[in-house]
Regions:
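Gly/Pro/Ser/Thr-rich low-complexity, intrinsically disordered segments predominantly at protein N-termini
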Residues: 1-192
Length: 192
């Protein structure tokens, strides 16, 4: 839900953090939906799989719910998971302690939740692509799909039996979607 009062990006960034994190678009605070169990498990699994990859390929780093701000777009979004290459990492300890990173990630990953409106996801996707994010993944836990978006190309939809890659950002990363979505079934009662 958006608040009625408009403000600047600087005013928004000066506010104390909220739980779940708030986002900022069109001069308004936008409450990010509280993640479901499915969303939380998928975000944790994605972060772990990228961390394992980065231990073998020291190309970048993964963050969970890190706010990325764009002054040009006057927006601040909190991807569920974000990836950046090391050459784009904040260079000072104080920059790393600040609440928002004033750059877009190299990969933005959003995990759709039941409370997400399609227009909200479409707005975030358009922002990421306009702001120059080379790869955006939208993960749908209900459909068990991952849709990959890159600027200037049609989206690619991967199903649970497919393997997604992270090109053009990470050329060697491969994600068998069964490995990702299997966390949703662990411990379930049969037939539930």
């Amino acid at each position: 839900m958006a608040t009625a009062t408009t403000m600047t990006l600087d005013e928004f960034l000066a506010l104390p953090e909220t739980e779940p994190p708030s986002e900022f678009a069109c001069g308004r605070i936008v409450e990010k939906p509280m993640p479901t169990w499915f969303n939380s498990r998928l975000a944790a699994r994605l972060a772990a799989l990228f961390e394992i990859y980065f231990m073998a390929h020291d190309e970048g780093y993964v963050n969970v719910e890190l706010r990325h701000a764009s002054r040009e777009e006057r927006r601040a979004y909190v991807p569920d998971v974000s990836i950046a290459r090391w050459e784009r990492a904040p260079r000072t300890a104080s920059q790393r302690r600040e609440g928002a990173i004033e750059q877009t990630p190299d990969i933005a990953i959003e995990i759709a939740s039941p409370d997400d409106r399609p227009a909200r996801i479409a707005d975030k996707l358009a922002f990421y692509l306009r702001a120059g994010v080379p790869l955006v993944w939208i993960v749908d836990p209900d459909e068990r799909t991952l849709t990959a978006y890159t600027p200037g190309r049609p989206p690619t939809v991967f199903g649970e039996a497919d393997t997604a890659d992270a090109a053009p950002v990470l050329s060697a990363f491969r994600l068998p979607l069964h490995d990702l979505f299997s966390v949703l079934d662990r411990g379930l009662e049969p037939g539930s």
